[in-house]
Structures are given as C-alpha cells and as structure tokens.
C-alpha cells in the first residue's frame, strides 16, 4: 500500500514560531513512516512557505536557543494554487523566494499565474495536512480556512473552533452560553484605554486580586502579567497600565482576569474524525518546582528552564474530581465544535469546582508538553496518537 503523503506545516508568523518548530521535531520523530510520508513545509516569520530548509528533526531546547525557520541555499518556495485542491502545492526555484519581480512575491499564499506554471514543479498529490502551528496565522482559523477552500483534508479543529478558541474573550462567550464556568474577567482595548476606566471596570465587575492580564489572542504565556493589589489607587492604576501595555504588544484585545484560588489541571481531548464522540485523557498537572509566592507558569518556566516544573499525570486529585475534569473537557470541546484534538486547561478550586481557563486547539507537542504526556499515561503512545489523528481525516 502506498504511503499517505502528509504536509507538516510548522513555524509561522506568530510569537509561538519557535515552539511550533520544537513541536514539529517531536511530531516528525514520532510519525509512523511505514504508513506516512511526511513533507515538512516551514513558514518563516515573515510568512514565506519553504521546503528544504534546516531539518526540524534535529531541533531541541537543550542548548537554550529557540529555533526558527530560516531560508538556506537549498530552500525552495512552496506556492499554492487553491483551484487545484490536493494537487495545488508547487515548488518554485530558489531565486523566487526573495525576488519581487518573479511574480511569486512574499505573500502568505500566492496563486500562480497559468503562464508561470512552467517555472514550478508539482509537490505531488497531498493526502492531508498536519498544521503544527501555534498562535495567530496558524491556530486561529486562517490556515484552516485556506485548506477548507482548497478542499485539502487537515488535522485539527475547523475554522470556527480555531478562531473562537484563539480569542479568549470569545471562548468565554461560547462556553458561557453552554453553561460551562470560566474565570471572571473584563476585556480592554489596549489601543484606547485609561487606567482609571479599567480600574472602574474591575471594581464594577467585583474582581478580586491578584489579577492576570493577558493578550486575548496569544499563547505560550506571552505577554502575561500578574498584578497584585496596591495600597493606593494611583499605584494600582500604574500597575494596570504597565500590564496592559505589555499584553498590548501582542494583541490590542486584552483580558483582565481574576486570579483563581485553585490548581491548574489540563486535560487532552482526542476526536480524530469530526462528529465522533471525543475522548478525554487522564488530567495532568504542571507542578512548579521553584516554590515562591510570585511564581506562575510563564514562557521561561514552560520552555527555557527544565528545572522549573515537571508534569504529573494523572494529577494528584481524587478520582471523582479527575472524572469531573474529563467531563468538563469533553463538554467544552463539543461546545466550540471541536475536531481532531485540543488541550482543555481548567482550574479546580478547593471545593471541587471545575472551570475552564482556555482551550488550545493545537497544543504543544514538544518533549515536555502535556498533550502527548497525558495520552501516553492514558495508554495511547505518541506514535499511535499521531497515526490516529492523520487517519481520522483520511477516513
């Protein structure tokens, strides 16, 4: 039987570019190459799609450096012709990558002119796409919409779920309509705000401190600030303004959320074929190993400091609470019309209440990521996980 040819997209224009690269190294290392022929296609930070760049299989975080998709002398541009569907992937010449006069430009995707097809080589028939892209321009429905338009099967959530879950404000709206609790908060426009008005909104909403201020459409803890209660209003406004400015560097839409007195418990959801009943893993917990009052799970704790935390699956909670988390995760996945995979992050309060923090529709696949670790602890190996996800969209 011929191997199914799978384009693996990685990199991208988002802040999470390097995390996508590390996730892809894990995915390619675990993919069953007896069944699938992976075709790695990198996306540079400025949006160029390339093939034959640096081999992502060799990337890791051991050296403390974050990898990026870079154009090499061997790189060739990948161009798309949406009208040709699964046969619409083409390779240009190396000189086309940076040549504005070539007609290929530097856009996110180009539709080659028929007269230019002679300068292109077909990438061949593509059976499916596995977009290992985190954050905007990859996990937010944009790439999913492109693949839908082309009629190319792809792994993961569709346009609506991807867009709704990328935007934490609208995640709250959808889950609230489904009766699923989330952390209380207010939304601020970082382009046009005064700290006094924000403080008034916080007080009107009855939010208690500490607060977590974060971009609405970013991941991997980029731009997140913990804000404690100050002794006076002027200091409080200064702290809020600084935190909103930090979040605003990543997104103009900013969430101000009440800190929850509870444990952060994550659950992996798997639904290879859209419409099937979703499965939930044993929930896990990121345990922080540097104990201090100000620590929270920021970007450096996640990726740059291996000694900062470790993963425990299942989390050290009563089985009844773990089952509640699994139930909430499945319900949340259904509420957003999820497909393929997601990681549902929850808070579990001391009284056992489970509320959703966020839904990641393309969770990290790095060696330290919760999603593959949770499924491995539930009895699904890394390789089996990827196989099921790909075969689900080929059925």
Swiss-Prot record:
<keyword id="KW-0547">Nucleotide-binding</keyword>
<feature type="domain" description="ATP-grasp">
    <location>
        <begin position="172"/>
        <end position="391"/>
    </location>
</feature>
<dbReference type="GO" id="GO:0046872">
    <property type="term" value="F:metal ion binding"/>
</dbReference>
<comment type="function">
    <text>Cell wall formation.</text>
</comment>
<dbReference type="GO" id="GO:0071555">
    <property type="term" value="P:cell wall organization"/>
</dbReference>
<keyword id="KW-0573">Peptidoglycan synthesis</keyword>
<comment type="pathway">
    <text>Cell wall biogenesis; peptidoglycan biosynthesis.</text>
</comment>
<dbReference type="InterPro" id="IPR000291">
    <property type="entry name" value="D-Ala_lig_Van_CS"/>
</dbReference>
<feature type="binding site">
    <location>
        <begin position="204"/>
        <end position="266"/>
    </location>
    <ligand>
        <name>ATP</name>
    </ligand>
</feature>
<feature type="binding site">
    <location>
        <position position="345"/>
    </location>
    <ligand>
        <name>Mg(2+) 1</name>
    </ligand>
</feature>
<feature type="binding site">
    <location>
        <position position="358"/>
    </location>
    <ligand>
        <name>Mg(2+) 2</name>
    </ligand>
</feature>
<keyword id="KW-0460">Magnesium</keyword>
<dbReference type="GO" id="GO:0005524">
    <property type="term" value="F:ATP binding"/>
</dbReference>
<keyword id="KW-0436">Ligase</keyword>
<dbReference type="GO" id="GO:0008360">
    <property type="term" value="P:regulation of cell shape"/>
</dbReference>
<dbReference type="Pfam" id="PF01820">
    <property type="entry name" value="Dala_Dala_lig_N"/>
</dbReference>
<dbReference type="InterPro" id="IPR005905">
    <property type="entry name" value="D_ala_D_ala"/>
</dbReference>
<feature type="binding site">
    <location>
        <position position="358"/>
    </location>
    <ligand>
        <name>Mg(2+) 1</name>
    </ligand>
</feature>
<keyword id="KW-0479">Metal-binding</keyword>
<feature type="binding site">
    <location>
        <position position="360"/>
    </location>
    <ligand>
        <name>Mg(2+) 2</name>
    </ligand>
</feature>
<keyword id="KW-0464">Manganese</keyword>
<dbReference type="InterPro" id="IPR016185">
    <property type="entry name" value="PreATP-grasp_dom_sf"/>
</dbReference>
<dbReference type="GO" id="GO:0009252">
    <property type="term" value="P:peptidoglycan biosynthetic process"/>
</dbReference>
<protein>
    <recommendedName>
        <fullName>D-alanine--D-alanine ligase</fullName>
        <ecNumber>6.3.2.4</ecNumber>
    </recommendedName>
</protein>
<dbReference type="InterPro" id="IPR011095">
    <property type="entry name" value="Dala_Dala_lig_C"/>
</dbReference>
<keyword id="KW-0067">ATP-binding</keyword>
<comment type="similarity">
    <text>Belongs to the D-alanine--D-alanine ligase family.</text>
</comment>
<keyword id="KW-0961">Cell wall biogenesis/degradation</keyword>
<dbReference type="InterPro" id="IPR013815">
    <property type="entry name" value="ATP_grasp_subdomain_1"/>
</dbReference>
<dbReference type="GO" id="GO:0008716">
    <property type="term" value="F:D-alanine-D-alanine ligase activity"/>
</dbReference>
<dbReference type="GO" id="GO:0005829">
    <property type="term" value="C:cytosol"/>
</dbReference>
<dbReference type="Pfam" id="PF07478">
    <property type="entry name" value="Dala_Dala_lig_C"/>
</dbReference>
<dbReference type="InterPro" id="IPR011761">
    <property type="entry name" value="ATP-grasp"/>
</dbReference>
<keyword id="KW-0133">Cell shape</keyword>
<keyword id="KW-0963">Cytoplasm</keyword>
<dbReference type="InterPro" id="IPR011127">
    <property type="entry name" value="Dala_Dala_lig_N"/>
</dbReference>
């Amino acid at each position: 039987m011929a191997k199914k040819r799978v384009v693996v997209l990685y990199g991208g224009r988002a802040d999470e570019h390097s995390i996508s690269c590390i996730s892809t190294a894990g995915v390619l290392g675990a993919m069953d190459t007896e069944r699938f022929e992976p075709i790695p296609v990198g996306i540079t930070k400025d949006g160029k799609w390339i093939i034959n760049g640096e081999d992502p299989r060799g990337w890791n975080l051991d050296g403390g450096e974050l990898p990026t998709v870079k154009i090499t002398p061997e790189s060739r541009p990948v161009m798309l012709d949406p009208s040709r569907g699964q046969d619409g992937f083409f390779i240009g010449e190396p000189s086309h990558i940076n040549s504005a006069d070539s007609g290929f430009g530097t856009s996110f995707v180009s539709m080659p002119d028929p007269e230019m097809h002679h300068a292109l080589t077909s990438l061949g028939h593509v059976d499916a796409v596995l977009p290992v892209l985190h954050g905007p321009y990859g996990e937010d429905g944009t790439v999913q919409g492109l693949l839908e338009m082309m009629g190319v099967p792809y792994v993961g959530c569709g346009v609506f779920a991807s867009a709704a879950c990328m935007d934490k404000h609208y995640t709250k709206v959808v889950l609230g309509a489904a009766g699923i609790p989330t952390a209380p908060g207010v939304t601020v426009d970082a382009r046009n705000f005064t700290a006094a008005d924000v403080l008034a909104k916080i007080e009107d909403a009855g939010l208690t401190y500490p607060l977590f201020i974060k971009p609405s459409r970013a991941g991997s803890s980029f731009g997140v600030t913990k804000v404690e209660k100050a002794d006076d209003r002027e200091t409080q406004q200064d702290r809020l303004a600084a935190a909103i400015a930090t979040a605003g560097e990543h997104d103009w839409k900013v969430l101000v959320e009440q800190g929850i007195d509870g444990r952060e418990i994550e659950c992996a959801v798997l639904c290879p074929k859209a419409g099937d009943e979703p499965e939930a893993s044993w929930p896990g917990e990121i345990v922080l190993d540097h104990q201090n009052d100000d620590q929270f799970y920021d970007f450096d704790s996640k990726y740059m400091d291996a000694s900062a935390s470790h993963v425990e699956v299942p989390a050290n909670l009563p089985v009844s609470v773990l089952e509640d988390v699994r139930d909430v995760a499945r319900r949340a996945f259904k509420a957003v019309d999820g497909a393929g995979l997601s990681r549902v992050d929850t808070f579990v309060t001391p009284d056992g209440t489970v509320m959703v923090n966020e839904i990641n529709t393309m969770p990290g696949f790095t060696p330290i990521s919760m999603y593959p670790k949770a499924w491995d602890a539930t009895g699904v190996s890394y390789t089996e996980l990827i196989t099921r996800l790909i075969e689900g969209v080929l059925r």
